[in-house]
């Protein structure tokens, strides 16, 4: 009876494969079809979800050496050798983005001249008309200066009418004459002091 049971078990085993065999385990796994794989768009580099583990054996993308904006997981912009050579030749990093050209033209709605530019005519200082006094006018002015170095307006007007000059010219002449008189006074005072300073060391010896 034991032999009959063993024979029946062997017949059942020959008809049905063992559930722990390699063929049975591999056949029970669901296979992903190629259209299903193609329907899933590949995620761009650098934005992979942290939950999805990376496939073992997949080479990690090398960082781009030709710009400073690429992340560590970004795809390389070119061959590693060419990118490394370009980065070694340039002393500064390349920046992405369009360069803004400098505007050298004239501003819109205005002339081509700069706002702070001033024409040559406006830089010229207005020169005063220098009055040439006659001998008679100089004598009258000097005579009044000896009497009064600071004449008032009425005195200047009377003198200007007598010597045929404007009162403004007479006032300017008195200002210049007082400045000249002060300069002569300081020069004469310093001339008197200098000989005494030079003679003092000789007297002490």
Swiss-Prot record:
<dbReference type="InterPro" id="IPR009057">
    <property type="entry name" value="Homeodomain-like_sf"/>
</dbReference>
<dbReference type="GO" id="GO:0009653">
    <property type="term" value="P:anatomical structure morphogenesis"/>
</dbReference>
<protein>
    <recommendedName>
        <fullName>Homeobox protein goosecoid-2</fullName>
    </recommendedName>
</protein>
<dbReference type="GO" id="GO:0043565">
    <property type="term" value="F:sequence-specific DNA binding"/>
</dbReference>
<comment type="similarity">
    <text>Belongs to the paired homeobox family. Bicoid subfamily.</text>
</comment>
<dbReference type="GO" id="GO:0000785">
    <property type="term" value="C:chromatin"/>
</dbReference>
<dbReference type="GO" id="GO:1990837">
    <property type="term" value="F:sequence-specific double-stranded DNA binding"/>
</dbReference>
<dbReference type="InterPro" id="IPR017970">
    <property type="entry name" value="Homeobox_CS"/>
</dbReference>
<feature type="region of interest" description="Disordered">
    <location>
        <begin position="33"/>
        <end position="58"/>
    </location>
</feature>
<dbReference type="GO" id="GO:0006357">
    <property type="term" value="P:regulation of transcription by RNA polymerase II"/>
</dbReference>
<keyword id="KW-0238">DNA-binding</keyword>
<dbReference type="GO" id="GO:0003677">
    <property type="term" value="F:DNA binding"/>
</dbReference>
<dbReference type="InterPro" id="IPR001356">
    <property type="entry name" value="HD"/>
</dbReference>
<dbReference type="GO" id="GO:0005634">
    <property type="term" value="C:nucleus"/>
</dbReference>
<dbReference type="Pfam" id="PF00046">
    <property type="entry name" value="Homeodomain"/>
</dbReference>
<dbReference type="GO" id="GO:0003700">
    <property type="term" value="F:DNA-binding transcription factor activity"/>
</dbReference>
<dbReference type="InterPro" id="IPR051440">
    <property type="entry name" value="Goosecoid-like_HB"/>
</dbReference>
<comment type="function">
    <text>May have a role in development. May regulate its own transcription. May bind the bicoid consensus sequence TAATCC.</text>
</comment>
<feature type="DNA-binding region" description="Homeobox">
    <location>
        <begin position="126"/>
        <end position="185"/>
    </location>
</feature>
<keyword id="KW-0371">Homeobox</keyword>
<feature type="region of interest" description="Disordered">
    <location>
        <begin position="185"/>
        <end position="205"/>
    </location>
</feature>
<dbReference type="GO" id="GO:0000978">
    <property type="term" value="F:RNA polymerase II cis-regulatory region sequence-specific DNA binding"/>
</dbReference>
<dbReference type="GO" id="GO:0000981">
    <property type="term" value="F:DNA-binding transcription factor activity, RNA polymerase II-specific"/>
</dbReference>
<keyword id="KW-0539">Nucleus</keyword>
């Amino acid at each position: 009876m034991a032999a009959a049971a063993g024979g029946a078990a062997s017949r059942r085993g020959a008809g049905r494969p063992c559930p722990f065999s390699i063929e049975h385990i591999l056949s029970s796994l669901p296979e992903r079809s190629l259209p299903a794989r193609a329907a899933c768009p590949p995620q761009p580099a650098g934005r992979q979800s942290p939950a999805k583990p990376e496939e073992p054996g997949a080479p990690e993308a090398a960082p781009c050496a030709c710009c400073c904006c690429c992340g560590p997981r970004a795809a390389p912009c070119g061959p590693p050798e060419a990118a490394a050579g370009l980065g070694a030749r340039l002393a500064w990093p390349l920046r992405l983005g369009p360069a803004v050209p400098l505007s050298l033209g004239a501003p819109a709605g205005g002339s081509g001249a700069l706002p702070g530019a001033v024409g040559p005519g406006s830089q010229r200082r207005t020169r005063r008309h220098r009055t040439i006094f006659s001998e008679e006018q100089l004598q009258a002015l000097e005579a009044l200066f000896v009497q009064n170095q600071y004449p008032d307006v009425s005195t200047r007007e009377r003198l200007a009418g007598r010597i045929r000059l404007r009162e403004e010219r007479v006032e300017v002449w008195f200002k210049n004459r007082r400045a000249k008189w002060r300069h002569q006074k300081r020069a004469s005072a310093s001339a008197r002091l200098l000989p005494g300073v030079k003679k003092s060391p000789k007297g002490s010896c």
